[in-house]
Amino acid sequence: MAPTDQLQEVKIMLHGTAASEGIGIGKVMLIEEHSLEYTPRTVTDTEAESQRFKAAVDAFCYNTEKQAENLRSSAGEKEAEILAGHIQIIKDPYLSGEIEKLIADGQCAESALEHMCDMFIAMFSAADDELTKQRAADVRDIKSGVLGILLGVNEIKVSDAPKGTVLVARELTPSVTAGIVKKNIAGIITETGGTTSHSAILARALEIPAVLSVEGVASSLKNGDTVVVDGSEGAVIVNPDDNTVAEYSKKRDAFLAERKELENYRGRETKSASGEVYELFCNIGKPEDAVKAVDADGEGVGLFRTEFLFMDRTSIPTEDEQFEAYKKAALILKGKSLIIRTLDIGGDKDIPYLGLEKEENPFMGFRAIRYCLKNRELFKSQIKAILRASAFGDIKIMFPLITTMDELREGKKLVTECKADLRNMGINFNENIQVGVMVETASAAVIADMLAKEADFFSIGTNDLTGYTMACDRGNNDVSYLYSPLQPSVLRMIKRTIECGVQNGISVGMCGEAAANKLMIPLLISFGLTEFSVSAPSVLNVRKIISTWTKEEADKVTAKVLEMSTQQEIVEYLKSVV
């Protein structure tokens, strides 16, 4: 046996980002990118070349629509819309128009497409935040798809992968993922991507264990290698021995049994072991997602992200369009609580037609409530739409990124003005609609005692609160180690916010990822949180975790945690008791 063969048979542990929970054991199938090389050329018949480009785009859109339909049935509407977004990007008037101009100047369709796509990829890749960087991957996927059609290169297909396959790629694009036959794929490993990447989102939707950002994995593995994918811990074991396979087979079976057991918590009240009752809501981005909240057994919606209504279009949605969207969600929920967050534009969410200037640090700049208070007609249109929809369900209004009392008061003043306008028009709405604050900055947490006197409720956004408190971007690998809601400073911000809410008799919820974190839940119970708002797939698991804790036990654990001075110390302790 050659030395290299001996080396390859040694058990190796690789590490990456835990992107989709579960254990997968199977054989590697490398997803190798097709060569899309071509010789740039000058064209003289520019009209024919333009028609060639348009035909390729039409074929791409047709293929993408079919892929989206596959995803719609295997994963869901939200996941299918990732691919629908690809169609909107390639048909964007600016992108397609600039490509047409280059063709008119004599460039071949391949060169024109590649030039413009590479420009967009560079722009998105240079962004500070992870979500905008993700758009670079989308444009790469689009470029490959259209180039492949122009060059006559077949699509990469994984639909024929046999049962027990682990897909390994540098980057697993949405277009490739759409072809996955769920029952045949044991796991996914990629060199790129994080927890918010489309690879991760799709893997979670398909319930396939996934580990991403494993450096060099696509070049170090070969087809047929046996691997274990631990999507819960972010580990990949190459060439596992029999004992390792047996160990992880047990872990996989236990994980699947636990997932099945969670169905026993469907239809139950969300209650601690000592009898305290909590509200367990879902986070949604579109009215249709309210169906997922109901199907997941959520008790309402704790966060409706309205900015998605403004995206993937070329103009501001009208008041009537917004009203219909909010009304639709309210009717689906049939009287269950629906907390609608007003427009949170800026930061990682850019809407081109609004003409926001590029900022050096958009997360610290002109976004959310700051933008809305400077663009009052747009803001009032949204508030009126929410008020009108409140006649059809239990709707509440929530302002994002509040940092001062003035912002809350100005926002409430506009609500009062909008109520008067609707009253004068004879339009029904809930006169007593609640107006709350999303606590996601250190400033809001520090003045939570004052905000609680004028807000009807709080919802803690731990994702931004953690980033702002720790002054770090979780998408930046150099500082991502700081990003954790279990940092002592962040825990104290959360504790203070909840205590201020309780002391002033208002409800306090949490809609960040921490609300579903099993290490955080006993602390949140002890702090006095009353509402948990999580992703739909997390509902039953959170209900189960809450049911295992008494308030007394949670208080004891929390008291010890608050004596600790480092995140590492806190995490190690919580892992030993949770």
Regions found by a protein language model. Give the residues of each.
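Non-catalytic, soluble scaffold/interaction modules
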Residues: M1-I332, L338-I345, N375, Q382-I383, ...
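Conserved alpha/beta-domain cores
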Residues: R259-V578
